[in-house]
Design a protein with these regions (language model features):
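Hydrophobic membrane-targeting alpha-helices
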Residues: 42, 46, 80, 157-161
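Canonical alpha-helical transmembrane segments of integral membrane proteins
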Residues: 32-42, 115-123
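Membrane-penetrating hydrophobic segments
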Residues: 19-32, 61, 65, 102-111, ...
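Intrinsically disordered, low-complexity N-proximal targeting/linker segments that flank membranes
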Residues: 1-38, 54-55, 158-180
């Protein structure tokens, strides 16, 4: 998503800075909340006295949704508190830096791809009558999107650090000569 926002050569010219920074923060809140939900549910399931009846998949989806909502609320308040009264250039600078960072753009691509894939799978399951997360209503769909964002983040980490060794392919700059 980040790569679709306009990106200027200079930070002070960056448009949509509030939207860019808020979108970034809320997207990270979805992934963080889902990870917290997955960890809490896994711990509860591993301790027999805390284990509740019901399918694990439902517990994971609902826990991911609940923790995503809580995390998004906390992070939203944190963003407001952190950026309250800041000059527009500070919003522009932070947004510009996000758009300038190739790793951040790649993380966003993978995260949104994971969310989209999970939502597509949820929709297909619902259309085919297989149930899936959609049978839990909006909470199941939101949980699927959150877990998809975690899957996308894991895919990004495997791609960037496993396959590519953490390095980016360097692009030739116009006017630069390659080595002798």
């Amino acid at each position: 998503m980040s790569r679709y926002f306009p990106h200027t050569p200079y930070a002070e010219d960056q448009p949509l800075s509030h939207v860019i920074l808020t979108t970034h923060v809320l997207t990270r809140a979805v992934t963080t909340g889902s990870i917290i939900g997955l960890i809490l549910t896994s711990v509860r399931q591993s301790i027999p006295s805390l284990r509740r009846p019901g399918p694990l998949s439902e517990k994971l989806l609902l826990s991911a949704t609940r923790n995503t909502i809580i995390t998004t609320a906390i992070v939203g308040v944190g963003l407001t508190a952190r950026m309250w009264g800041r000059e527009p250039i500070e919003w522009q600078d932070r947004s510009w830096r996000l758009l300038e960072n190739r790793g951040q753009l790649e993380t966003d691509d993978w995260t949104y791809g994971g969310m989209g894939g999970a939502l597509l799978a949820t929709g297909l399951m619902g259309v085919r009558g297989a149930g899936g997360p959609a049978r839990l209503g909006w909470r199941g769909v939101a949980g699927a999107a959150g877990i998809g964002s975690v899957g996308g983040m894991i895919g990004y980490m495997a791609w960037r650090y496993g396959i590519n060794g953490g390095k980016f392919v360097e692009k030739d700059k116009k006017g630069e000569r390659k080595g002798i």
